[in-house]
Amino acid sequence: MGKETPAEKSLNLIRGRLCDPSYVFRPLSASSDSNYSKLKFIVSTSITEGCNNSMLLLGPRGSGKAAVLDLGVGDLLEQFPDSVSVIRLNGLLHSDDNCAFKEIAKQLCMEHHLLFSKMASFDDNSQFIIAMLRACGLAHKTIIFVLDEFDMFAQGKQRLLYSLLDAMQSVTSQAVVVGISSRLDADQLLEKRVRSRFSHRKFLFLPPSREELDGLFVHLLSLPADSGFPSGYVSRFNDKIKNLTSDTRFKDILKTLFNANSTVNSFLKFIFCAVSLMNLESGLLSLENFKAALSSMQRQPKLEAVRDCSVLELYLLVCMRRLEVKEQSSYNFISVMKEYKAIHDSFHTSDYYAQNVCLRAFEHLRERQVICYAENRGQSQTGEYRLQKLLISASELHQGMRSHACCPAILLKLLDH
């Protein structure tokens, strides 16, 4: 393999940054008022002062709850390497109490180099966990229980939550329970006996501000001056990034992106797409890269459905649209076939199919939810007599047909007139 060019090297560097949560969330966590700072302070207090704590991290998926927690726990593990033990559960995997207790016992055994018994009963595992909490407390070691998909644990009898929180009432225990959930009402799901033992400390993960986004954008994409890149290339690359942040067209792209999804995770995917489209000859990111990235992020299933239609199905869709233009808001297969025959008779098109073939294409459109029944009445009627309606707008149909690989030119003409 040949030597990497500066463009290839910068591409690999930025991709590595985007895949490293600690690098991504470090600048967002710099403020003393950030969730990272508050969370780290509470957990470090539990470690240094030997007290128990519980908290919830709430926010939409992709907002960085788990990443910020991992960042804080990672820093504490470096600061107190022999005083912290982390147990991780996921509600999608361990919502069953028996399974959850067994998993906790297994992770505790691995952490403390003990033998784990697969045959241990629920009571055995429960007693073992309580004994380990007591022993770790006496040894001034804090156990951090991370419960991802916390709302899944807040269903049923909630024995796991009750047992953990009840054991933390003991003077000798030293533990922190951190719940992570995308449900903002997760604490309201708790039973009264569990809620009374929970601290009700909640951290909300809100979308980043515009200033934070600009700072994150520069942080992720700027090249360091002392990284082995040619100095001229670094200055050109970084100047291009700064110019983009002040470009109104780029701001409009970001606005469109965040109207659909305002999470950090969505922003990272957007940047990753743009970086992957970078021209390796120039080695610089352009506005066009970000426009293309936005297009790839904006899934348009209706347009995709039109692009995947057969030519016959396109004819049927155009017929239905023409009937709507004629102020015929609802129609059945029979009236669509009359319009289809009228088009064939007027323009002598070669794409003319038998009625039974057209009916199968019509049913296929309904199966793909491009069209649907106009009303629930008339269920006793056969499919070709029931009223139908289009589920796509005229602009979506036109756009989908223009990007269709085999769309006959006559259909676009018929759609416009």
From Swiss-Prot:
It is found in: Nucleus. Component of the origin recognition complex (ORC) composed of at least ORC1 (ORC1A or ORC1B), ORC2, ORC3, ORC4, ORC5 and ORC6. ORC is regulated in a cell-cycle and development dependent manner. It is sequentially assembled at the exit from anaphase of mitosis and disassembled as cells enter S phase. Interacts directly with ORC1A, ORC2, ORC3, ORC5 and ORC6. It holds the Pfam family ORC4_C. Follow a cell-cycle regulation with a peak at the G1/S-phase. Isoform AtORC4a is expressed at low levels ubiquitously. Isoform AtORC4b is mostly expressed in siliques, flowers and flower buds, and, to a lower exent, in roots, leaves and stems. ATP binds at G59, P60, R61, G62, S63, G64, K65, A66. One of its GO terms (biological process) is DNA replication initiation. Induction: Regulated by E2F. Accumulates rapidly after cell cycle reactivation by sucrose addition following cell cycle arrest mediated by sucrose deprivation. This is Origin of replication complex subunit 4. Keywords: ATP-binding, DNA replication, DNA-binding, Nucleotide-binding, Nucleus. Belongs to the ORC4 family. The keyword Hydrolase does not apply. The lineage of its organism: Eukaryota, Viridiplantae, Streptophyta, Embryophyta, Tracheophyta. GO terms for cellular component: nuclear origin of replication recognition complex. GO terms for molecular function: ATP binding; ATP hydrolysis activity; DNA replication origin binding. Component of the origin recognition complex (ORC) that binds origins of replication. DNA-binding is ATP-dependent. The specific DNA sequences that define origins of replication have not been identified yet. ORC is required to assemble the pre-replication complex necessary to initiate DNA replication.
